[in-house]
From Swiss-Prot:
This is Transcriptional activator rinB. Pfam families: RinB (PF06116). Keywords: Activator, Transcription, Transcription regulation. GO terms for biological process: regulation of DNA-templated transcription. Activates int gene expression, probably by providing stability to rinA. Int activation requires both rinA and rinB. The gene is RINB. InterPro entries: Transcription_activator_RinB (IPR009300). It comes from Staphylococcus phage phi11 (Bacteriophage phi-11). It comes from the Viruses. The keyword Repressor does not apply.
């Protein structure tokens, strides 16, 4: 009977540890979502894709 109590206590501690870690993860994800700044616009002098078309064109050397 004593062995059953020890196993039960270990399982309870593992469950508590798992819930603690889950709470940490969820809290971190909520914090990241709440502090995300998705409204950032590119600076006016930022290179446009059309400005780099000559760099992206494949060159074939013969």
């Amino acid at each position: 009977m004593g062995c059953l109590v020890v196993v039960k206590e270990i399982l309870r501690l593992l469950f508590l540890l798992a819930m603690y870690e889950l709470g940490k993860y969820v809290t971190e994800q909520v914090y990241i979502m709440m502090t995300a700044n998705d409204d950032v616009e590119a600076p006016s002098d930022f290179a446009k894709l059309s400005d780099q078309s000559d760099l992206m064109r494949a060159e074939v050397s013969e």
